[in-house]
């Protein structure tokens, strides 16, 4: 599943080809992904793309007349191609530009989304979100205050978009291991020093993943079609039964909040 680094890598990859260009047309090869594809997106035809930004795991393609909002879902990816490049299986949406290029959206599992919002009217999916993890607003003081009295497992806590956006399963596992914090620890029981370390490791892990082009486990590809290389940096995710890179004990796996969780029962307390 594409997480924040993968979405940011996609944004960085498509932006140079699209900002300042004019939208010629949309092509929809399916009426529905996770939700119905709104025909209001066609209001953006003829509009200049002013900016491409990201909020949590959503990409925002901004024009003066509204915004196209893209979510990659479980298996989505975006590529910039020549307009005559033939569509393949699972190529569901094309955004055609007047410069002869297209932004092509591929999504085998169709859990992604294309949405529309009017100018200066944020879409409902972007409401009630916490701060971005790579901003100064996300810091030890902030999360320690939010965690006071909370008994929820720390892994679920840092994956809650109302607390902080975009810390997905892969990066939550990796950050907790680097911080030597057991994923089932109650969030309200962490010390200020542990919060400081965890926040630092979340930021560092996400930044390295972005530099490496994200994590490709199955479907994700960058805008140029290349895979992300952060999978080579993974310490615990997907490695149950393998030796812990620190102590050599077998890494463990269990479900926490319906998500596969990987950790070392010796190193993480």
From Swiss-Prot:
This is Formamidopyrimidine-DNA glycosylase. InterPro entries: DNA_glyclase/AP_lyase_DNA-bd, DNA_glyclase_Znf_dom_DNA_BS, Formamido-pyr_DNA_Glyclase, FPG_cat, MutM-like_N-ter, Ribosomal_uS13-like_H2TH, Znf_DNA_glyclase/AP_lyase, Znf_FPG/IleRS. GO terms for molecular function: 8-oxo-7,8-dihydroguanine DNA N-glycosylase activity; class I DNA-(apurinic or apyrimidinic site) endonuclease activity; damaged DNA binding; zinc ion binding. It catalyses: Hydrolysis of DNA containing ring-opened 7-methylguanine residues, releasing 2,6-diamino-4-hydroxy-5-(N-methyl)formamidopyrimidine; 2'-deoxyribonucleotide-(2'-deoxyribose 5'-phosphate)-2'-deoxyribonucleotide-DNA = a 3'-end 2'-deoxyribonucleotide-(2,3-dehydro-2,3-deoxyribose 5'-phosphate)-DNA + a 5'-end 5'-phospho-2'-deoxyribonucleoside-DNA + H(+). GO terms for biological process: base-excision repair. The active site is at 2 (schiff-base intermediate with dna), 3 (proton donor), 57 (proton donor), 259 (proton donor). Monomer. The gene is mutM. DNA binds at residues 90, 109, 150. Keywords: DNA damage, DNA repair, DNA-binding, Glycosidase, Hydrolase, Lyase, Metal-binding, Multifunctional enzyme, Zinc, Zinc-finger. Belongs to the FPG family. Involved in base excision repair of DNA damaged by oxidation or by mutagenic agents. Acts as a DNA glycosylase that recognizes and removes damaged bases. Has a preference for oxidized purines, such as 7,8-dihydro-8-oxoguanine (8-oxoG). Has AP (apurinic/apyrimidinic) lyase activity and introduces nicks in the DNA strand. Cleaves the DNA backbone by beta-delta elimination to generate a single-strand break at the site of the removed base with both 3'- and 5'-phosphates. It comes from Vibrio campbellii (strain ATCC BAA-1116). The keyword DNA-binding applies. Its EC number is 3.2.2.23, 4.2.99.18.
């Amino acid at each position: 599943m594409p997480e924040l680094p993968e979405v940011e890598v996609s944004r960085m990859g498509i932006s140079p080809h699209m900002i300042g260009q004019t939208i010629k047309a949309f092509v929809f090869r399916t009426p529905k992904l996770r939700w119905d594809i709104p025909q209001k997106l066609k209001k953006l035809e003829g509009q200049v793309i002013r900016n491409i930004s990201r909020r949590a795991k959503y990409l925002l393609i901004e024009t003066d007349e509204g915004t196209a909002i893209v979510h990659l879902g479980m298996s989505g990816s975006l590529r910039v191609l020549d307009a005559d490049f033939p569509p393949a299986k699972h190529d569901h949406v094309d955004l055609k530009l007047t410069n002869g290029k297209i932004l092509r959206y591929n999504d085998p599992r169709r859990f992604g989304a294309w949405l529309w919002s009017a100018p200066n009217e944020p879409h409902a999916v972007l409401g009630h979100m916490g701060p971005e993890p790579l901003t100064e607003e996300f810091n030890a003081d902030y999360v320690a205050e939010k965690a006071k009295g909370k008994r929820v497992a720390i892994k679920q806590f840092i994956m809650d978009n109302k607390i902080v956006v975009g810390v997905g399963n892969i990066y939550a596992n990796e950050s907790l291991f680097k911080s030597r914090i057991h994923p089932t620890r109650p969030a309200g029981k962490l010390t200020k020093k542990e919060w400081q370390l965890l926040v630092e490791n979340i930021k560092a892990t996400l930044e390295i993943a972005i530099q490496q082009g994200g994590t490709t486990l199955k479907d994700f590809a960058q805008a140029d079609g290349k895979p992300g290389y952060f999978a080579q940096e993974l310490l615990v995710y997907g490695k149950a039964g393998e030796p812990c890179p620190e102590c050599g004990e077998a890494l463990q796996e269990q479900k926490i909040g319906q998500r596969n969780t990987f950790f070392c029962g010796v190193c993480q307390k």
